[in-house]
Amino acid sequence: MAVPKKRTSISKKIIRNTLWKKKGYFTALKAFSLAQSLFTGNSKSFFCNKYKR
């Protein structure tokens, strides 16, 4: 039968949680930055139609 290993320390848990949260923060920041550049029309890496007909 499988036996659980030693308990993960609180500090390790906090470090992992912080890294996980930072990852989400930077992803959201990138998405917001792209949305801003699309809105202002300064985007050089994303192609979209500027005019609606």
UniProtKB/Swiss-Prot annotation:
The keyword Ribonucleoprotein applies. One of its GO terms (biological process) is translation. Keywords: Chloroplast, Plastid, Ribonucleoprotein, Ribosomal protein. GO terms for molecular function: structural constituent of ribosome. Disulfide bonds: none annotated. The keyword Transferase does not apply. One of its GO terms (cellular component) is large ribosomal subunit. It is found in: Plastid, Chloroplast. Belongs to the bacterial ribosomal protein bL32 family. PANTHER family: 50S RIBOSOMAL PROTEIN L32, CHLOROPLASTIC, LARGE RIBOSOMAL SUBUNIT PROTEIN BL32C. HAMAP family: Ribosomal_bL32. This is Large ribosomal subunit protein bL32c. It comes from Phaseolus vulgaris (Kidney bean). The lineage of its organism: Eukaryota, Viridiplantae, Streptophyta, Embryophyta, Tracheophyta. The gene is rpl32.
